[in-house]
Amino acid sequence: KVQDAAQKAVDTRADTEAMMVVIRPSTGEVLAVAQTANADKKGDLALTGLFPPGSTFKMVTATVGMQHGLVTPDSTVPCPGTIKIGSRVVHNYNDFSLGNVSLTKAFAQSCNTTFADVSSKLKPGELKSTAQQFGIGQDYKIDGLDTLTGQVPQADELVDRVEGGFGQGKDLASPFGMALVAATAAAGKTPTPTLIESHKTTVKNTDAPTIDPPTIDKLRGMMRAVVTSGTA
């Protein structure tokens, strides 16, 4: 039933390369993998296609910012229509501006400029290591599925950290990888994805620590705001 529902959902965008992956957060069970016929022409894009994750990646940026004490959900942050950081000029959609608002509101309204600013204050490698805590960059060997999660660079250069903060530049993720990110937020730790219950998934690069529960709780509240008062 989940597979049928997922396929019907992506087929409403049949003229595009639409994809969906559904993972049960509590167990890691892959419940559905669906994509349109246009996506099928290019292979298993839902599982192995790598794309800039865009604003969905702000979950990672918000988390790393909170982990390193840069922000809290209630922090007052700038959301100008445009911002120049180093050599990079970052724009919000249609250059909308909210002025100074809480991080939660900036997250709910998807302020690129806010998260570029937060990310610019990170050290090289911090965004990458937090992405790994969500499963991005992990290597899974799943019986019955070939998958790629994505890749986030070390970002030694400021411009790479700025662009990475709102899911652009060199950040790449698959729909499968972003399904893991959402499942991690729901479960509090990254579930090990499985397709066949009796077949164990092999995981490489498992040294990423679990995100602390208070930070996950704060992230969930911000994600809820996207639905109740934001862009969802």
What are these regions (language model features)?
Residues 48-57:
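Gly/Ser-rich catalytic serine loop of serine hydrolases
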Residues 1-19, 40:
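Extracytoplasmic/periplasmic proteins that interact with beta-lactams or build/remodel peptidoglycan
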Residues 18-43, 68-232:
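Beta-lactam-recognizing serine transpeptidase/beta-lactamase-like catalytic domain environment
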Residues 63:
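Extracellular glycan-interaction surfaces
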